[in-house]
Amino acid sequence: MIIRKCYINNPNPFFTPPKNNKRRPSFICYAMKRASEIDVARCELNYILQIKNIKIGFPVKRFRRLNEHRACAMRAMVLAMLYHFNISSDLVQASVEQLSDECGLSTLSKAGNKSITRASRLITNFMEPMGFVTCKKTWDKILGNYMPKMITLTPLFFMLFGVSEKKLMDAKKQQLGWINKNLISKGFKPITMIDAKRRSKDTQIKNIFQYRISKHAFYKKKRNAQRLISLDEKEARQTILRALVAKYSITELTKLGPNGLKKQVNISYYYLRKIATNTYPDN
């Protein structure tokens, strides 16, 4: 039997910031510096925390530490998640596919099919059961498919590299204060943490769909959009409204109000019309 010397594509993954490489808040720069100086894959928390089954919440026995390949992937992934972290909402504003690409964890088969298994298994089989992140997968009733996972970083995640929950909360308050100062200077009312989280959720959904689009996903969305747009406009808008009501919480709907909800319906409707007529961007 032939034994492979290496069963992974990239034994030394590292995080490469996206081309736009926007300036990050000082807290994120500080956290990334800490995470690069400390071996997060061999942190004491990885040995003392009890891994849990995400579906039922019961502890699961662990018999060994992270193997070196997964440890290398985790070191890169932690930096990527921090780079895309939204302080106000605790969300990672990037899809698993984008994180995988930027960490060099994605592979391409001879047939041209992309695989992000190494990154997704790291998150699903280790980081989430350990309590470092939480993931939420939402069914998009408008387009008829699953939206990319919404990844939230927990206080335990920051403890991997010695950033306390208090320091995180101070950064969140400072960030919200900066946002409100900017809004007030433009004549708008200040927002709460709930408002900031809702805005971040909307922005993330839009950005992730723009990034992860593939031919298969594109044409599937296009078919669903065409089906919806082919309906009477009033019926199409009612379908979108029901989907939006299901997407937002009661608190978020209260904050939006009738006018805000109507605006979201208009945005979604014209977005679907655009999808229905667009062609796949080959270049």
From Swiss-Prot:
This protein's UniProt keywords: DNA replication, Plasmid, Plasmid copy control
Function: This protein is essential for plasmid replication; it is involved in copy control functions.
The keyword Magnesium is assigned to this record: no
Pfam families, A to Z: IncFII_repA
Family of the protein in this entry: Belongs to the IncFII RepA family.
Name of the protein described by the UniProt record: Probable replication-associated protein repA1
InterPro entries: Plasmid_replication_init_RepA
Naturally occurring in which organism (per UniProt): Buchnera aphidicola subsp. Acyrthosiphon pisum (strain APS)
GO terms (BP aspect): DNA replication; plasmid maintenance
Record bears the keyword Amino-acid biosynthesis: no
Superkingdom per UniProt: Bacteria
